[in-house]
């Protein structure tokens, strides 16, 4: 089984009406220590910056990606797709998702990674999901942003302190 972050469900008024939002409880912030932060990167630059974190057990990564020429883009960890956004079909990892402002062509993610699980909170918690961490043992890419000429507008990496 997986241990999940404690989260808080709230209602938020959006341009499309009231929506249910799921975010980690605020106490989780006290476990996170900022390590690195960058802005306006190409996917290749972002991938290079993240190399130093390939072997980390517990990380938090906050990022915003902007699709300009790509119709799909995402973020993998050793071949495992953490984010796969298809703008044409409005899907995120194969499930329907439409951003609040589809014309912005941006997607923000707050990703918590530990030894056994990955939890992702999209666009401030409007969409969230978790998965078992299952890296491809033959994959050496580590963290890998993908998509035709995407911009990684913001990339922040945090260490996450264990509570055990």
Predicted features by range, described:
Residues 1-164:
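Beta-rich accessory regions
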């Amino acid at each position: 089984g997986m241990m999940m972050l404690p989260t808080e469900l709230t209602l938020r008024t959006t341009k499309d009406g009231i929506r249910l939002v799921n975010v980690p409880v605020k106490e989780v912030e006290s476990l996170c220590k900022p390590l690195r932060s960058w802005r306006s990167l190409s996917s290749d630059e972002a991938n290079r910056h993240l190399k130093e974190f390939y072997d980390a057990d517990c990380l938090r990564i906050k990022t915003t990606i902007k699709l300009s020429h790509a119709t799909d883009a995402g973020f993998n960890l050793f071949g495992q797709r953490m984010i796969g956004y298809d703008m044409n079909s409005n899907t995120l990892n194969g499930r329907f998702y439409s951003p609040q402002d589809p014309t912005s062509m941006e997607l923000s993610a707050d990703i918590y990674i530990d030894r056994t699980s990955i939890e992702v909170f999209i666009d401030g918690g409007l969409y969230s999901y978790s998965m078992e961490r299952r890296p491809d043992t033959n994959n050496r890419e580590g963290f890998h942003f993908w998509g035709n000429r995407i911009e990684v507008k913001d990339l922040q990496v945090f260490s996450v302190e264990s509570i055990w």
